[in-house]
């Protein structure tokens, strides 16, 4: 009888005993070819050959998309480290969720599910079975550009990180628009989560969640990439609490049909001032976006919710006008946030520094028995925050959003020269 195990750490299997020596299971020989696996249950040669054999049995209808999917499969180093072509008839109960700047999102039941259940008896990966997924339709993707496809190809290793939203593959809907298949995150994005929480979260939850986002951003930057479109709508909440927040839309910036995208696209409050002035996106512009996310967490409100997102706001941002910092914000938190949104990109911290600093805060707050200035500031702020939470628990505190404030990506034509 086969024994099925859920997917856990794919990079290292448990050790096993051979004679009087312990040998990592990842070096255990593949039962098919005798070569060592490179990660949990993954024989590079056998998996690659199996995928190559299937190349003749599927096509997206566009050569460049086929090449993209094949590229991810031939370079996979573990299960789900690649994209699949999944016919649309494999999905049931397709339901519209909402629209963004360049597409719409649907939920659906994927009957087969991803190939991420380990069958210990058969020594192979099996499909998980029915799973709810999100289908992100790319508007006008009948005319999808080769530059957009190459963009996904360049970012695909970032997409497969466990710090990003799980991405399974690509399909095509009955209108011939292509769709990205992702895990369905039942708690929605950061804005939706904050709305359900009346915009007030505990400081420890905020810091812990930001730590995970910083690690994801560090991963993107370590790959030599830039997110370019980091905002609250692209942070997806997996669990009831925020610790499972993932970064989405990595490598999916801008309309899919643009061949040379010269216009600035995105959510204005999160775009760094130097980008608004015409400079290229950079790791530093991602850090600016992170600073605005820090403010979104601390206030519980969408940035610049009370102003039109127009040329006047863009000028204000370039003139170093910044968002209000709540009185109950710990000093150490406010200082880091202000560093992130500094008008000079050279003065902003790196993602690596953010990861290190946020991890240090968690240690000082949760695991260090000795008093510290960080812990004292945190304790005062958390006590204030808990009082606010208790006072607002039964009230609707959602502020009225300006009718010309937009929180989905769009081309900012008013910035064009």
Identify the residue ranges that each predicted region occupies:
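Glycine-rich ATP phosphate-binding loop
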Residues: 42, 104-139
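Short beta-strand micro-motifs within the conserved protein kinase catalytic domain, predominantly
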Residues: 166-178
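Conserved short submotifs of the Hanks-type protein kinase catalytic core
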Residues: 175-189
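Activation segment of protein kinase catalytic domains, centered on the conserved DFG
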Residues: 195-211
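Catalytic-loop of the protein kinase fold
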Residues: 221-238, 244
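Conserved catalytic-loop aspartate of Hanks-type protein kinases
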Residues: 286
């Amino acid at each position: 009888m086969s024994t099925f195990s859920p997917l856990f750490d794919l990079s290292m299997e448990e050790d096993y005993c051979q004679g009087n020596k312990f040998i990592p299971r990842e070096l255990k020989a593949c039962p098919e070819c005798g070569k060592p696996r490179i990660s949990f249950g993954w024989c590079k040669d056998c998996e690659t050959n199996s995928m190559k054999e299937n190349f003749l049995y599927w096509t997206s209808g566009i050569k460049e998309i086929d090449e993209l999917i094949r590229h991810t499969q031939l370079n996979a180093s573990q299960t789900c480290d690649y994209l699949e072509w999944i016919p649309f008839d494999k999905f049931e109960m397709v339901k519209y969720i909402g629209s963004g700047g360049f597409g719409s999102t649907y939920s659906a039941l994927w009957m087969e599910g991803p190939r991420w259940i380990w069958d210990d008896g058969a020594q192979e990966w099996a499909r998980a079975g029915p799973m709810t997924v999100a289908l992100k339709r790319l508007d006008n993707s009948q005319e999808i550009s080769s530059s957009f496809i190459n963009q996904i190809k360049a970012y695909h290793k970032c997409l497969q990180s466990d710090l990003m939203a799980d991405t399974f593959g690509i399909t095509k809907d009955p209108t011939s628009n292509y769709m990205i298949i992702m895990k369905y995150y039942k708690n929605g994005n950061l804005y939706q989560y904050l709305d359900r929480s009346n915009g007030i979260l505990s400081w420890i939850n905020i810091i812990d969640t930001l730590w995970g986002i910083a690690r994801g951003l560090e991963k993107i930057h370590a790959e030599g990439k830039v997110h370019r479109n980091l905002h609250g709508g692209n942070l997806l909440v997996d669990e009831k609490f925020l610790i499972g927040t993932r970064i989405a839309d990595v490598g999916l910036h801008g309309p899919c049909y643009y061949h040379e995208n010269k216009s600035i696209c995105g959510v204005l409050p999160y775009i760094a001032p130097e980008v608004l002035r015409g400079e290229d996106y950079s790791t530093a512009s991602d850090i600016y976006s992170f600073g605005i996310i820090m403010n979104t967490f601390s206030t519980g409100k969408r940035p610049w919710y009370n102003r039109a997102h127009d040329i006047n706001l863009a000028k204000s941002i370039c003139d170093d006008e910044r968002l209000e910092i709540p009185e109950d914000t710990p000093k150490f938190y406010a200082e880091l946030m202000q560093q992130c949104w500094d008008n000079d990109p050279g003065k902003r911290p790196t993602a690596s520094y953010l990861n290190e600093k946020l991890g240090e805060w968690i240690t000082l707050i949760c695991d260090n028995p000795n008093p510290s200035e960080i812990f004292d500031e945190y304790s005062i702020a958390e006590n204030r925050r808990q009082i606010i939470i208790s006072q607002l628990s039964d009230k609707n505190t959602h502020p009225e959003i300006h009718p010309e404030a937009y929180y989905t990506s769009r081309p900012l034509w008013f910035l064009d020269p």
